[in-house]
Amino acid sequence: MSIRKCFLWQISCVVSIQLITTVQPLAAQTASESERLQKLERAVELLQKQNAELKAEVNSLKSKETASVPDGKFKTKVTYDGKTYVEKAVVEEKKVPVYVQQAGSEIKLVLGGFIQTNFEDGNVSAFEGRFGQTALKDRFRLRRARIGMTGDFAQNFDFKIEGDFEQNDGTSPSSRVDFSGTDIWLNWHQFPEAQIKLGQYKAPFGLEQLTPDTTLLIIERSNTTGAITPDRQIGVELWGKPFTNIWPEQKDLLTYYGGIFNGNGRNINNNDNNNFMYVGRLELMPFKGKIFGQESFLKLGGDVLNSRDDAGTNISQSGNLLVNSDGSLSSFVLPGADERTAWGVDAWFELGPFDLIGEYLEEYVNGRTVNGVPPGFANFTTDGFQITSGYFLIPKKFQAAVQWQYLNPGQKGNDGIYSITGGLNYYIHGNDLKLMINYIHTWSDFRQANPEFGQDEFNEVIGRVQVMF
């Protein structure tokens, strides 16, 4: 029954009762005609008043009923009665929001990722030794496209699983990219002084290598970092900050890392032999505070690495260690067994808008005879450095950066490669949305000493758009 019908019925009942209660006394009384008329007038006035109150209540209920449907929640529905099509507005049902819930018992779960797109023009990647027989063409490049998830458990475990759509691990041809894992690890952190990390991640060697891709001041890492550092490996490490609880104000004073890894690269579950790669790193932050009212710090670091590898192992993950006949560089896949030892030192000083970063790396690659089989290559020593500086011309928005780098592969006489890079970074929304542009000039000592192979100086421009989510 509608509201209108319900209240009309109530009004009729009230009128009837009022008439009965009014007429009966009038019939029984012997009062004058004027008294009877006065009583009737009062009864009519009372009925009119009650009728007005009931109408007001009906109107109030109607307005509430209409207001219960939110604005903009109507949709047009077309019906057919057999003769014509009729359009009418009907209330649109509210949709239940869609959400994702973890299947496990994680107390924290975060989904994120980032995309880096490059435009590369000129002598593309010449600073990495890609010229001559390994030269690349001008290109647009999806440099990285990663998606990952991190989480925490109440039982003092945290984890990360991340993959990249732009890697070429095992793809054919090698220029083809595919999706593969980057960081896949589990970390036990009950004691900040002694945490255990297990899985695939960057072995703790090299400051520039360990700096996140999204926070680098220069678009690409230096040639030295690519040639010597082991990048991502599968293994386990013990790491921590010894002063976290005993000296909380100086918890970052010292950080240590010590790990054991397969040593033959990422996304490879089989070890190349029964030996492992041993990696260690120490970081010291003797100062963290303010200088001239500016947030500042000084961080010092040192690394060491040792690995015994078998034939077929790629000891240069970035593909820029083996010196070709024309002085260009490519991946160094061992023709025989080796033992390699590397070390490095680094420093990072920040004073407000100014950063100064320096790093030196050195690696000894010595052949091993296994089961009477010679290594098939001569021993060599590779070394190099990078010095990087940045300054915010507009605080937190517009930054100028410069880098000087050098790599001595050490396999042919006078085979060093130098590069100087100048760049500008525009932080539209911090590192979440950033534009970068670099100009790189490169010299090849080998090409200069052997002009028959062609040019010995190279130029490149790289632009990048970065989005994090």
Regions found by a protein language model. Give the residues of each.
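C-terminal segment of classical bacterial N-terminal signal peptides
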Residues: 17-26
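Outer membrane beta-barrel
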Residues: 96-306, 380-410, 415-420, 444
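N-terminal periplasmic/intermembrane-space "pro-region" immediately following the signal or transit peptide
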Residues: 26-116, 123-128, 248-251, 469
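Outer-membrane beta-barrel pore domains
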Residues: 134, 172-174, 185-189, 200, ...
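A general secondary-structure boundary signal
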Residues: 37-41, 47-61, 65, 114-116, ...
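Bacterial N-terminal signal peptides that target proteins for export
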Residues: 2-13
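Low-complexity, intrinsically disordered short segments enriched for Gly/Pro and polybasic residues
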Residues: 10, 24-25, 74, 78, ...
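Acidic-residue sensor for enzyme active/binding pockets
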Residues: 33, 41, 53, 57, ...
